[in-house]
Amino acid sequence: VSGCGGSSLPEPEQATPAPLKQGEAIEVPFPPPPARVEFIPEKPNSGAVWIDGEWSWTGRRWAWTYGRWVIPPSSATFARWRTARTSDGILLFAPGTWHDERGAQIAEPLPLAVGVAREGEVILPHGQPEKTAPNQVPAKTPQAH
């Protein structure tokens, strides 16, 4: 069982994050909810690494992307999703991204296995609770480019 971060599972090499800047990140009106707790499937391959589940911004609300086992691209690093406030209080969001050895963004590898969220509830921006089912279909599935 896992939530975002703090995992003892094999993880990809982490990219050093640059400071978030307007124009390079997405402006969002409010922070994401707390991470969902997920049941992590058995590691499907000895070379696989675990990418924790994460929130992504849909333009209107936060959507959960389930954690997943992937084979990392050769010499690639992974920059975790993050939020930051500008000096004037604007909240910025940058999704998790993969980068090649030159730092260029590359497509996320297809998942070998995906985590399953436990049943629970998230609170929407205006305070309304929304139920989450344990086997809810992921809001976003990584796509090959």
Residues covered by each model-derived region:
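Sec-dependent bacterial lipoprotein signal peptides
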Residues: 1-3
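Low-complexity segments
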Residues: 10-140
